[in-house]
């Protein structure tokens, strides 16, 4: 689907955020949002600013595919987001996105210490890029 897609890597301290280009081809990192009472409002502002067509939220399933406490927290947060934004909200499996993001940052010469501030949004980029690639494949 053409248009800007937003993606969130939900966390208890920070929420990593990424957006796509208007063609829905490339994921681009945005500044992470501090988790807390204002997070949903901040995300709603980004939906408006970028005229997003949807919001993709990472669902942190366990490696066996089952849902644990983190997945339940992400589901609850996604439900709250859906009540605030006027676009579809979709939960997408995010297993290993943070690992992939850490690996990419390490290969770019970033240490764990210097990656801390950007890892959440880097994970959101991995999540969104995977989503965009899957959407393109299904459109073929």
Task: Mark where each language-model region is.
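Phosphate- and other anionic-substrate recognition elements at nucleic-acid/protein interfaces
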Residues: 1-8, 12-140
């Amino acid at each position: 689907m053409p248009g800007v897609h937003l993606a969130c890597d939900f966390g208890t301290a920070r929420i990593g955020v990424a957006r796509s280009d208007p063609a829905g081809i490339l994921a681009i990192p945005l500044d992470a949002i501090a988790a807390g009472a204002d997070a949903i409002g901040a995300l709603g502002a980004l939906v408006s600013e970028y005229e997003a067509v949807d919001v993709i939220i990472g669902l942190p399933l366990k490696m066996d595919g089952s849902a644990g406490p983190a997945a339940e927290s992400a589901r609850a947060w996604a439900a709250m987001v859906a009540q605030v934004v006027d676009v579809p909200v979709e939960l997408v499996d995010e297993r290993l996105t943070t690992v992939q993001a850490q690996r990419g940052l390490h290969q770019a010469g970033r240490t764990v210490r210097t990656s801390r501030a950007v890892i959440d949004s880097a994970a959101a980029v991995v999540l969104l890029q995977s989503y965009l690639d899957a959407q393109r494949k299904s459109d073929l």
